[in-house]
Regions:
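Glycine-rich/acidic phosphate-handling loop/turn and adjacent ATP-lid/helix
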Residues: 155-187
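Conserved C-terminal segment of the DHp
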Residues: 23-38
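Short alpha-helical segment of the dimerization/phosphotransfer core of two-component systems
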Residues: 51-56
Length: 227
């Protein structure tokens, strides 16, 4: 009952926020297009207002996704994909902390993680997790997304350990703890990521031991034909 009430409240908030955010965004575009040329100071102010408005619109969209997933009204796609290949492709395009000389790469088993899932949503979930972990690393280090297949209680799963390269195995062997979704600057992308992963029958957790400055572990069950 409480979960249903929370989902209804979130849905109402999304509806109430969406219209004013869209109106403000539209007026800002009109201001830039129709007004006399702005000086540098005013242009910067409008640019910052547009960025903030775009962030608010993105947050409303994330709230909508969370609300729909909680209410069970969003159907996750089911298509065959190799999760390890998806992780590899994502890792090649991640540059979240490149300015601090933090490198990111996929390692471990390159293929063989056949799952049935929603490719677009899984990509967004893993991208959010990667950004969160990279933000917490010290300068000049290498973070890896280590890919392996592991069996637990007779069920084989694709396991991805995201951690600084020297702490991967320790993170994998550590007791599981709750993954902190309340990291600043990432909006609702991490709560959304957890819901997407759990919607695929998987789990997202952090190592309980103090290994490195941040790590995340994801496990998704393989397709029955691949177990």
């Amino acid at each position: 009952m409480a979960k249903h009430a929370c989902a209804e409240l979130l849905s109402l908030a999304v509806h109430e926020f969406r219209t004013p955010a869209s109106v403000v965004s539209g007026y800002l575009r009109m201001l830039q297009r129709d007004s006399t040329p702005l000086n540098d100071r005013h242009r910067k102010m409008v640019d910052e207002a547009e960025k903030s408005c775009a962030r608010l619109v993105a947050l409303v969209t994330e709230m909508s996704e969370v609300s729909k997933l909680d209410a069970g009204v969003t159907a996750l796609g089911k298509e065959p994909l190799d999760l390890f290949v998806v992780v590899e492709e994502l890792a090649e395009g991640v540059h979240e902390a490149a300015d601090r000389d933090v490198r990111f790469e996929a390692r471990g088993q390159a293929t063989g993680a056949a799952v049935m899932g929603d490719a677009a949503r899984l990509r967004s979930a893993f991208a959010a997790i990667f950004r969160a972990i990279l933000r917490e690393q010290p300068a000049a280090c290498t973070v890896v997304a280590d890919r392996r297949v592991a069996a637990h209680d007779g069920i084989s799963s694709a396991v991805i350990v995201v951690a600084e390269q020297g702490t991967v195995q320790a993170a994998y062997e550590s007791q599981p703890a709750a993954f902190d979704e309340k990291r600043g600057g990432l909006g609702l992308t991490l709560p959304l990521a957890r819901r997407i992963i759990e919607g695929h029958g998987g789990r997202l957790w952090a190592p309980a031991s103090a290994v490195g400055r941040g790590a995340a572990i994801v496990a998704l069950p393989l397709s029955e034909s691949n177990r």
